[in-house]
Amino acid sequence: MDREEAAKELMAMLEEAQEGPYYSEEEVRAHLLEILAPRNQVYMTGDTHGQFERVIEFCARREVEPENTFVILGDAGLNYYNDRRDRKKKDQLAQVPITFFCLHGNHEMRPSEELGYEVAEYHGGKVWMQPAYPNILFAIDGEVYDFNGNSCIVIGGAYSVDKYYRLARGWSLFPDEQPSEEIKAKVERVLAERNWKIDIVLSHTGPLKYEPTEVFLPMIDQSTVDKSTEVWLEQIEAKLDYERWYFAHYHTEKEVGKIRIMHNDYTMIPHEASVAAEKDMLRRMHRQAEIMEALGLLDDAPNQKNGDDIS
């Protein structure tokens, strides 16, 4: 659903609403998010592990533009082999007219000068970039980026729960997969300088108390899993004043309060102006619903419909 389609559908919904059908707040919000979004849209998804077909299809469907940003919340799968196989994946993404903004995961090497990366600037923060692939960027942990008026701090890395499985098969394992003490100190220093207030946290794993234990693999002995990063993030979360926190890593999709765990789903980082407009529209919608309810027009409301693939 693009902006024009969203506008047409919302107009049709408003016309139908004059005759009684009631649309949910979530359904209206999905359309407003598309209509009110700025041109420099920021999309986001979870781990891709080198499988970019769904991302490329999504970008084609959305008719993305070079000034748009696509955030991958770690384990993009672009720095795994450090050979032609990685270059093939990068060549694939280089054809997509959008800037990919990747967090560091646990199943990949950290970008460095040794891998041919250079430090560049993007949306107010430092990133790693290879000159041959200027639209593929890797965030630097502890940096704060401005996406549509939102201050966003990045915290990559996690522990590989499949560590021993990978070692037994001779698969790659990266010793610096988790944030170092130096990185942790930087993150805490940056947040302290901001009086522990940030709009959005983008991380690969998340605070310990939000672990989706219901999807844990039964063959993994959790007592062998190093959860020091999650414990540290929980300590960060306890004293942080934030609006939203997005992370991936667990290959599941879940929302708990201000926390959202992402996998194959998509969302957008909204513009602060669009958020204000959305809230105003929703306030008016609530008022209209109250009036309709008082008149007894909501008693026979139809079943609610499904929204778009962005939420």
What do these predicted ranges mean?
Residues 3-9, 20-29, 35, 41, ...:
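Core catalytic region of metal-dependent phosphoesterases/phosphodiesterases
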Residues 15-22, 134, 148-227:
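Active-site-proximal loop/helix segment associated with metal-binding centers of metalloenzymes
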Residues 33-43, 144-154, 200, 256-260:
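Beta-strand-turn-beta hairpins that frame and shape the catalytic cleft
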Residues 44, 70-73, 200-204, 246:
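Structural motif
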Residues 49, 76-77, 106-109, 158-160, ...:
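Catalytic metal-binding/acid-base residues of hydrolase active sites
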Residues 91, 99-103, 118-123, 129, ...:
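Conserved beta-sheet core of the metallophosphoesterase superfamily
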Residues 295-311:
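Long, low-complexity, intrinsically disordered segments
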